[in-house]
Design a protein with these regions (language model features):
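Major-groove DNA-recognition helix of helix-turn-helix-type DNA-binding domains
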Residues: 49
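Conserved catalytic core of two-component sensor histidine kinases
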Residues: 35
Length: 77
């Protein structure tokens, strides 16, 4: 989780990603941010995020996003 938080903080250091639960809904993460984030996650965590999983509820919080990463990683094993 800390690795993900580091990535998010690099993008928006002013945001408290440990508490924020509406990153997409409140416009903290815009579409370009999400594209960059997906690229970094795929590189750092060695996963591929399927297009069907690129939905706001997976990107509204670091916790939800990390749960998605873990689920994908488990499926790949």
């Amino acid at each position: 989780m800390e690795q993900l938080l580091d990535i998010l903080r690099e993008m928006h250091p002013e945001t408290d990603f440990e508490r924020e639960t509406r990153l997409v809904d409140d416009g903290v993460l815009a579409s370009f941010d999400i594209v960059m984030l997906i690229t970094r996650i795929e590189e750092e965590f060695d996963v591929v995020i399927p297009a069907k999983d690129i939905v706001p509820e997976h990107f509204n919080s670091a916790k939800a996003l990390y749960a998605l990463i873990e689920r994908i990683a488990e499926q790949d094993d």
